[in-house]
Amino acid sequence: DAGQFRKVKDILLLDEARQYVIPSAPGRRFKDDDKVTDLLYRCHKQKSAGEDYQDTFDLIAARYMDIAEELGLHVDLGAALDEVNEKIDAGANADYCASRGEYLNGLLLADFMGWRFMDAAEAVKFTADGAFDAETTNTLMAEKLSDGVPTVVPGFYGSYPDGTIKTFSRGGSDITGAIVARAVEASVYENWTDVSGFLMADPRIVPHPREISSITYKELRELSYMGASVLHEDAMFPVHKAGIPTNIRNTNDPSHPGTIISLNAPHDDLHPTITGIAGRKGFSVISIEKAMMNSELGFGRKVLQAFEENSVSFEHLPTGIDTLCVVVSGEVFAPKRDIILSRIVHETNPDTITVYDNMSIIATVGRGMVHNCGTAARLFAAMSKAGINVRMIDQGSSELSIIVGVNDADYESTIQAIYNAFVK
């Protein structure tokens, strides 16, 4: 709403080095409110079904008109809304419809700030098959922003070679911000959101978890992969590659320093050894046993090929001398279960093959673990004390994380036990 626009302007004017801003679409103003992006998707769905979408579109238009009126803006918002409405009515694709939330918000913010507006479709490029074209995008973005003029670039979307609009996945404005940061060789990428950085654990499971002041990109990748969701995980790659630190900040608490993400975070804040804990439920573990498996050439490839042929990617691959376990998403695996198992049996002739469903995978992540003896012992002792049965263990050679598998029923208590062992 207009109040958030004013907060954004205050933040931008606090530091003249803030020259580029990437807005997302308006979110919820209150608990039962609709996000503008959801309303735009609804318009597309209603139009595709032959239903009248105008009432939904009127809700969207009213949101933007209210903001423009309260801020006294001069941009021709009516013409922009009419263009969007006409294209939805003409059958524009879902990506075009969804992207207009950021586009319209960008027009308003540029007018409010007195900054230049640049349509992201001019520089954020995808290949014909829908893959993000990072290098072409970086070249175009760097060229267009080379004059140093303060610019608003709407997030979330870009375009195919033919100009058709293509979006990133939800939360993709984070990615656009990282793209712009890389293109202008920024000293820091500030990602302003509604939380003051990352927490060491999910506050829905651990009451009032400690804040994370600094974290490395590698640590964040581990935590994001396992479910931590403050920043879109794909937003890390452009700035990580360029060595640009990211600062997660809170729009509603701008004085809070937030969390700094960098290539090499300082080691003076390693207490309490771990950086964070994250996990996900709903995995299936396929355990394949065969005597002398380790001496059979191509055994692992044959097993994984059965999953690949059925478009099921594996999450983890713990192994023993005569045992190979494949951890996959239970939801993705379930409809293809029989055909995959039959394929594995046909190709490898195992002694036994067993499937364990309803498994949770929990990652304990921290650059400090490599410097501290007995980290794994503390972790497993805490789980044992809490009466939790460890179903799977996986630790990489980098010692950046320890991954454990437990029954879904033990998910919350496992995170609580690990947190209490290292933090409390």
Task: Name what the model sees in each region.
Residues 257-424:
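A conserved regulatory-domain signal marking ACT and ACT-like small-molecule sensing domains
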Residues 45, 69, 244-247, 345, ...:
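Non-catalytic alpha-helical coupling and interface elements of nucleotide-dependent molecular machines
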Residues 1-232, 236, 329, 405-407:
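Nucleotide/pyrophosphate-binding catalytic subdomain
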